[in-house]
Design a protein with these regions (language model features):
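Catalytic core segments in nucleotide and nucleic-acid processing enzymes
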Residues: 2-138
């Protein structure tokens, strides 16, 4: 069961199965970061997520380029996973991967918001796995 320890304006802290706190933070660059607290004020950077919410397909490649720049910075800061969430209905994945090679995973915002389907399930499983957040009982 998800154990939320603290909710702040731009972050929430959840306790993992190991007892270590994970911070899920909303930031400027990247948009969302997930970090594990190893010791007081000592963090392991886990996931950096860029959210590109614009719906204009003609501008998606510029937005993916912006995500790439953000992910390159995140990699230099030690983030091990970089994900990009897009809000367009059609995305040429081959081109997107070539424009943002540092993106480990692309997700559809529509799929995530719907809270169902293969992309949502993959996103959820990966977050839970990388943060050791226990699954709810089935």
């Amino acid at each position: 069961m998800l154990r939320v320890a603290e909710v702040r304006e731009s972050a929430m802290e959840v306790n993992s199965a190991t007892g270590r706190p994970f911070l899920i933070e909303f930031a400027a660059d990247p948009d969302i970061i997930i970090r594990e607290e190893m010791a007081h004020q000592d963090y392991r950077n886990v996931v950096a997520i860029e959210v590109k919410s614009g719906t204009d397909i003609s501008n998606i490649h510029n937005r993916i380029g912006e995500a790439e720049k953000s992910h390159q910075k995140a990699r230099r800061r030690g983030f091990t996973e970089c994900w990009t969430v897009v809000n367009v209905s059609r995305l040429d994945m081959t081109k997107a991967r070539s424009e943002s090679p540092s993106t480990d995973r692309f997700y559809s915002l529509t799929e995530l918001v719907s809270r169902q389907g293969a992309e949502y399930d993959d996103f959820r499983r990966r977050v839970m796995s990388l943060t050791a957040i226990p699954s709810p009982p089935t």
